[in-house]
Amino acid sequence: MADNPASSSSQQLLALRVMRLARPKFAPVDGFSHDPVDPTGFGELLAGKVSEISKESRQDLPIGEYLIAPQMFENIYLGETFTFYVNVVNESEKTVSSVSLKCELQTSTQRVVLPCSVQDATIESSKCEGQVISHEVKEIGQHILICSVNYKTSNGENMYFRKFFKFPVSKPIDVKTKFYSAEDNANQDVYLEAQIENTSNANMFLEKVELDPSQHYNVTSIAHEDEFGDVGKLLKPKDIRQFLFCLTPADVHNTLGYKDLTSIGKLDMSWRTSMGEKGRLQTSALQRIAPGYGDVRLSVEKTPACVDVQKPFEVSCRLYNCSERALDLQLRLEQPSNRHLVFCSPSGVSLGQLPPSQHVDFSLNVFPVTVGIQSISGIRITDTFTKRIYEHDDIAQIFVS
């Protein structure tokens, strides 16, 4: 961290030191390969000398038996805990009193006061007062740690100085989301696909990836059982892992009221790096684009997947009134020009008056003429009051054999 001192006097009796606390790393092993069946034994002898010099008993492992302290100021990532040790040292030959230390962390949007217990302390010559402070980083970008010290000299003079320590905070993961609305599902289910990419320069192990839904939805995680178990949760730098969630309406009796809801919930993630450092992130509220159903919505409730050619089959449909007024609806069937499927049901049938947020069921008899995968099209719903026609094509596909 780069420091920038600022003081009210050039001659200070106290000195301020700040040190970031980070976990050590495993020391790498400079392995020496040799032929274990060398009849001369020279390779084994040379490998033994290398082990004697390096103090490592095993040369066949990628990491050693010893830990090393960080050799440089490593990156700080969003969601991690920033821990540092702040120490006030009396470098003079006099005792100072009323020593108070204040630590603040300033970002581009706010200034946070960090808890510090060094208050009204008395520090004798060559003595010190310090404290370990931890803070969860919640913003990316430039951060400034501001440490201010107030104290009194033996002559009763009030002294003050402060130091600034600047460091950047990067984003450890990148989250991309996609929403899929099951418009043919009467339950108004919504599927969320989340792609998580490790944008840091270190390996991470995903401990938890959960969706915290809004009050309007219940969530189910659609997780694939990885044949490698927890190995699938290990993300190397630039690795991407996908997660899928299904959200169903909490109020199953009023599913049509969910068509305009856009707030889905928040994605909650936690992970650990190679030495066990923990990180946690929660996204902002996820928003989806509400599907445009119009005033009416048609769904296929029941239909066979395969049928025999020239053998009629039945398709069960359900029509929803998504508007805020009652609709007087009429069903009309248009025979397709290709004549692969032919409607056998009467056209121009009245479906009656449909109140808001209600539905009506009806069935269609269809005669398959041509083999292959055929689409059901040509269903027309007419609002007899406004004379508006709602066209429904390709509502289902049938395999004709």
Curated annotation (Swiss-Prot):
Signal peptide: none annotated. One of its GO terms (cellular component) is TRAPPIII protein complex. PANTHER family: TRAFFICKING PROTEIN PARTICLE COMPLEX SUBUNIT 13 (PTHR13134:SF3). Belongs to the TRAPPC13 family. This is Probable trafficking protein particle complex subunit 13 homolog. It comes from Caenorhabditis elegans.
